[in-house]
């Protein structure tokens, strides 16, 4: 079951990763034409904010799923109007543990991203070829974000594969689920 959840969920994970990769790709595209762009310095705030948002969404999803029985979606914002009522049913320890996990995840993700990001790109000798290569990568990224080249785009239902609803929910990327439901609730 674990392998099937991972396999079926990979498409939404790829879509979510594609969205998160778009800004660094644009920064790298611009850095082809400029000299000594400080990639790490430019991307550090993006990495920290992105890592914090990912950590918050994943931890909140894991914390709420046992109570709600469905993936995190835009309905969470209805409860944020009255946070005291929302937190009245859980212990302080429950909340503190999740806050600790959020901090550790944020730090771990941001640290990893900084580790794999070069301080600056080496000078690209053929800027036209470098630009074409980055645009080709951008096109590939667009296909990943869209979910392929077929008529249907990425959606939560595409990862459902089982009669067991828990397995289907496990395959859904919580960041994708939240953003998708926010787009539909407007």
Identify the meaning behind each predicted range.
Residues 1-184:
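Transmembrane and membrane-interface helices of multi-pass
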